[in-house]
From Swiss-Prot:
It comes from Danio rerio (Zebrafish). Was named Toddler based on the phenotype. Interacts with aplnra and aplnrb. This is Apelin receptor early endogenous ligand. Belongs to the Elabela/Toddler family. Keywords: Angiogenesis, Developmental protein, Differentiation, Gastrulation, Hormone, Secreted, Signal. The gene is apela. It comes from the Eukaryota. Expressed ubiquitously during late blastula and gastrula stages and becomes restricted to the lateral mesoderm, endoderm, and anterior and posterior notochord after gastrulation. The lineage of its organism: Eukaryota, Metazoa, Chordata, Craniata, Vertebrata. GO terms for cellular component: extracellular region; extracellular space. Disruption phenotype: Zinc-finger-nuclease (ZFN)- or TALEN-mediated apela gene inactivation induces embryonic lethality due to heart dysgenesis around 6 days post-fertilization (dpf). Mutant embryos show cardiac dysplasia ranging from a rudimentary heart to no heart. Embryos have minimal blood circulation, with an excess of erythrocytes accumulating at the intermediate cell mass (ICM). Larvae display variable posterior truncations and, at times, tailbud duplications. Posterior tissue defects range from loss of the ventral fin to complete tail and trunk truncations. Residues 1-22 form the signal peptide. GO terms for biological process: adult heart development; angioblast cell migration from lateral mesoderm to midline; apelin receptor signaling pathway; cell migration involved in gastrulation; cell migration involved in mesendoderm migration; chordate embryonic development; coronary vasculature development; determination of heart left/right asymmetry. CDD domains: Toddler.
Length: 58
């Protein structure tokens, strides 16, 4: 039982490091939205408009 405890901690630390490095490079967001097309200013939502738009409703 004492043998598996350090391996579990090492696996947990490695998982956290991979998630942090993927978040820094921005691959996590792209990986989750591969099938969606990015619309204006790289936003995956359909009804998203830029802030400088004059139209009050999309």
């Amino acid at each position: 039982m004492r043998f598996f405890h350090p391996l579990y901690l090492l696996l947990l630390l490695l998982t956290v490091l991979v998630l942090i490095s993927a978040d820094k490079h921005g691959t996590k967001h792209d990986f989750l939205n591969l099938r969606r097309k990015y619309r204006r200013h790289n936003c995956p939502k359909k009804r998203c408009l830029p802030l400088h738009s004059r139209v009050p409703f999309p």
